[in-house]
């Protein structure tokens, strides 16, 4: 039997499918998620149910978003899960997670995310951060390092700034390739994202912050002065106390927000 087949399902490369099979890792992730009935529990990419089954055991209802029609069909006929699941068949990148919110109940979102869409999916989920209590995701280890990086690190970039603007980022555990079927070619890790109820550095317009970060990190080896010359002048960098000869990975989240707010003020 092919090592891409697990529980009768062949992993689909185009969906980035790698199924978690290590019981100890599963237990640790479920413990970190801490499922309960006081939140709207949401799983992205339930796959063959490695996390779905133990989480569903602990709650009355679990909402799942799954793209693969074959896996959706399996979930609809699952002898235990079918009565507890609310299943949305579709692309999580296009899904309106806001429709799942219930007055007085924030979401706990989790999943073993397809590595080929993890970064754009993070950006999509940040749009719903105010309705989310916690997020726990299995990701490529490299992505977790980027999420949790500090200024000056090679991994520090646009994803770092936006993630840490919206959330406290906490790496939970590292997961080796042999914990999956088929085994991915990269190491994996679980991360906890805790959206801020009150942001430490409020931005006047997140769209401006996002654009500024994209522009700054577009050419990482060039200076801020070079990359942002159409957005901020040398005098404005000086007003902010930011050395414009620095490279984008040397600038803190607080400083990126300050730059974005100055751009907003100029537009007003």
From Swiss-Prot:
Family matches, as Pfam families: RrnaAD
GO molecular function: 16S rRNA (adenine(1518)-N(6)/adenine(1519)-N(6))-dimethyltransferase activity; RNA binding
Gene3D superfamilies: Ribosomal RNA adenine dimethylase-like, domain 2, Vaccinia Virus protein VP39
Assigned keywords, A-Z: Cytoplasm, Methyltransferase, RNA-binding, rRNA processing, S-adenosyl-L-methionine, Transferase
Subcellular location: Cytoplasm
Binding site for S-adenosyl-L-methionine: 18, 20, 45, 66, 91, 112
Top-level class of the enzyme under EC nomenclature: transferase
Stated name of the protein: Ribosomal RNA small subunit methyltransferase A
């Amino acid at each position: 039997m092919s090592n891409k087949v697990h529980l009768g399902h062949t992993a689909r490369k185009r969906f980035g499918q790698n199924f978690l099979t290590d019981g100890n890792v599963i237990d640790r992730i479920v413990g970190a998620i801490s499922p309960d009935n006081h939140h709207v529990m949401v799983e992205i990419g339930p796959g063959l149910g490695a996390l779905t089954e133990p989480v569903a055991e602990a709650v009355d209802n679990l909402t799942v978003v799954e793209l693969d029609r074959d896996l959706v069909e399996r979930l609809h006929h699952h002898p235990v899960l079918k009565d507890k699941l609310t299943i949305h068949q579709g692309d999580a990148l296009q899904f309106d997670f806001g429709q799942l919110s219930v007055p007085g109940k924030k979401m706990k979102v989790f999943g073993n995310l397809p590595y080929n869409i993890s970064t754009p999916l993070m950006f999509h989920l940040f749009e719903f951060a105010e309705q989310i209590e916690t997020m726990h995701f299995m990701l490529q280890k490299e992505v977790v390092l980027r999420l949790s990086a500090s200024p000056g690190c090679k991994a520090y970039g646009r994803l770092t700034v936006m993630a840490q603007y919206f959330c406290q980022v906490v790496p939970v555990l590292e997961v080796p390739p042999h914990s999956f079927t088929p085994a991915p070619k990269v190491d994996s890790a679980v991360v906890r994202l805790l959206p801020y109820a009150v942001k430490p550095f409020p931005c006047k317009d997140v769209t401006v912050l996002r654009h500024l970060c994209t522009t700054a990190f577009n050419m990482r080896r060039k200076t801020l002065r070079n990359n942002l010359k159409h957005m901020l002048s040398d005098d404005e960098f000086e007003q902010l106390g930011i050395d414009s000869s620095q490279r984008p990975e040397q600038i803190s989240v607080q400083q990126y927000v300050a730059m974005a707010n100055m751009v907003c003020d100029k537009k007003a």
